[in-house]
From Swiss-Prot:
The lineage of its organism: Bacteria, Pseudomonadati, Pseudomonadota, Gammaproteobacteria, Alteromonadales. One of its GO terms (biological process) is division septum assembly. The gene is ftsQ. InterPro entries: Cell_div_FtsQ/DivIB_C (IPR005548), FtsQ (IPR026579), FtsQ_C_sf (IPR045335), POTRA (IPR034746), POTRA_FtsQ_type (IPR013685). Keywords: Cell cycle, Cell division, Cell inner membrane, Cell membrane, Membrane, Transmembrane, Transmembrane helix. The chain crosses the membrane at residues 21-41. It is found in: Cell inner membrane. Residues 1-20 are cytoplasmic. It is a single-pass type II membrane protein. This is Cell division protein FtsQ. Part of a complex composed of FtsB, FtsL and FtsQ. Residues 52-121 form the POTRA domain. PANTHER family: CELL DIVISION PROTEIN FTSQ (PTHR35851:SF1). It comes from Shewanella oneidensis (strain ATCC 700550 / JCM 31522 / CIP 106686 / LMG 19005 / NCIMB 14063 / MR-1). Residues 42-262 are periplasmic. Essential cell division protein. May link together the upstream cell division proteins, which are predominantly cytoplasmic, with the downstream cell division proteins, which are predominantly periplasmic. May control correct divisome assembly.
Amino acid sequence: MSWSDKRRHWRARKSQVNWYLWSGIGFLSLVIGSFVFGGYLLHKFLNDASTLPIEAVAIKGERTYTTDKDIQIALQDLMQRSFFSADITLVQQALEALPWVYRASVRREWPAKLRVYLQEQQPAAHWNGTAWLNVHGEVFEAPSHPELEHLPHLSGPDDMGTEVLTAYAQVNSLLKINGFTLASLNLTPRHAWHATLGNGIVLDLGREDKMARIQRFITVYPLLAKQDKPIARVDLRYDTGLAVGWGDAQTREPIINDEKPR
């Protein structure tokens, strides 16, 4: 074979190889393009609220303070998304932002439903005059409810809610078995305790030995009750003894009082 024939043969094979190469590249591009376009159409379909709308929201869980209207308002914007594109995390956050909702769990349920389980706050006490304390000792903000007016009034630093709630349970238990009720309990920023009984008597308990001081009041109260004047305040911040404030004048009279208050 002459040199010129070899060159023609090589060019023909090179042209054939190039044709195969470009054909393969074109086919691969077509396949990739089809996948991309198909993915785009699928994405558009799944995110089209008119094609796959959320048709219902099923609410489970016992509710006392959270109404259907509250839930509807909280979710009205999020429900404009399709069944697949709705952000479950945002739905959960919107529900947990409702004042009386403690926790919310949300899941999709085919073909067009969201299933929601709500756990409401369980208020244990009024807190600092404007908020609530739940049964876990956590502070939360929510509107007042007439049926909760009977709850005790507790106050103190917000990070001490658990301690105040625990102290209330202890003090109230001791008072209750001795015929008293505890209406409010306050912990000051300096960690001093003040209790108000259901009959209006204020007990200054100080920072130490509050349970022993409550017991001292219970022991001495029959003696105080025999006095022909109303008791307004009892200062128990002493190692032994106490001081009594009588009536509206709040004049204090020491009884077996031999130590400085603390």
